[in-house]
């Protein structure tokens, strides 16, 4: 009897503490199990429907890359109409391109490749669906065309991120920046920046120091050609930003391994009042530092 009274007292105290925090006891239990890795833990068993856009160029790349390299779940290709008909079905995940508009933007600036789970609330929009991964791909208006070269790398990074998120909530919640290998992983490798990925305000002195450290800045086409070499010791930059960056927009800066397809760096940056975006002096200095 005394033991039962002690247990009952402890339970009452625990309930009181939870209630004082505005939480019901069952909410505490849910908080322990409903983490991202639990929510997407069924990903390997579900079919991922890859939603084709109707654009032959982008659809061809999507089909080729998914068919040749997607390995963490079964998949099939579908139309936008199929997505609309099945988005409420929790038996499916969906990979699709979608444009996003940030709060201070006048119009959507960037197009993302996202993987979401079907289910309740899907009729309210993609933002209400459970997200497994979202990756910036290109400008929403007048994209550069570089996305076709980088899409295989993006899909590879998304696959790796989803797989890691199923075992490590720190990565799942912290995002792609946490998943990336980090600038330290670039030591001993050649890093090549496309000139269009670099801030227009980058001081010449920083460029000179970068060059001395073995970091190159070349034309966009020259940088992108390195992707096809398969060079395991080469890393290439990619920046996704609106075609006309404005204050309140964002850009995304990335470094990919040309040969290993690894994501070495990922960072989201707000666009300043002057519309400038791209890799800045502090990032070049950090890259140079790991080479000393």
Model region roles, listed by residue range:
Residues 1-7:
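N-terminal secretory signal peptides that target proteins for export/translocation
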Residues 7-16:
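Sec-dependent N-terminal signal peptides
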Residues 16-27:
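C-terminal segment of classical bacterial N-terminal signal peptides
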Residues 28-112:
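Start-of-domain marker
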Residues 30-41, 122-292:
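C-terminal/domain-edge helix-coil "capping" segments
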Residues 108-127:
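Aromatic/basic-lined ligand-recognition segments
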